[in-house]
Amino acid sequence: MTTERSSEISSPYAAQPAATSAAAPATTSESKPFDLDTVKKVRTVHLAQAKATGQKFSMLTCYDALTAQIFDRAGIDMLLVGDSAANVVLGYESTLTITLDEMIPLVAAVSRGASRAMVVADLPFGSYEQSPQQAVASAVRLMKEGGAHAVKIEADASMAEWVRALVRTGIPVVAHVGFTPQSEHALGGFRVQGRGDASERVREDAVALAEAGAFCVLMEMVTTQTAQLVDEAVGAVPTIGIGASNATTGQVLVWQDMMGVRTGRVPRFVKQFAQVGQVMEDAARAYREQVRSGEFPAAEHTF
């Protein structure tokens, strides 16, 4: 599979030019340039347009309605209800533990809270690997019961048929390549992917899944060179990076990481934009102290 061939991949979700009418007036007013910030409801076509016009888009993980509302107001374009909920919401040590039944209520909560952002739901470990039919059944539940707009699947070239089956069913797919956390044991732990000759394998995976119909390719923990190769190879299909440099169309982070809620060591690719965890701890401590001292509730808080 050559780069020349794969670079011609077009997104099936890209906007199609309007048909020309013979009765149309000779002169028409020029349409306004596409601006993702003006979109009232983000859809797959808008992400394809973003790549076509050189605009970047943002994605954050999200697991509840109130946080979805906050991120919506901030203009975040996509919300990922990730299997990372296993760690940051449910307290499991591994993302492998979370089940489809545990994911669906989280997806539904985010869907109820979001009005502009596209909601993407992870297919958790054990919910799709057996067959394309199992993947479709699980994805249908995430969309029907959870209200997701799309699903994300960790896959390689051998699972192109899974993507085709989902797309045939009418389910938009984000294909996750590079480091895939659900395969952490097979990959030898949390390790950067795509070094040296391995970059070609990541590229081949991405191209195969894009050709199968994925509307977006997410790359995790890959080298800058690999990210550049993949973004070019998949053509019009947008790319999302997490630890994949700024060569991608969009970026995603776990919100508890980028806002400093989780304590301890954070991955190298995380930038902490705030220390929300410390603010919460300080507020909780102040509340406890005022309750113990009798300062709260004061007269203005009583009837």
Give the ranges of each region predicted by the language model.
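Alpha/beta enzyme core
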Residues: 2-53, 57-303
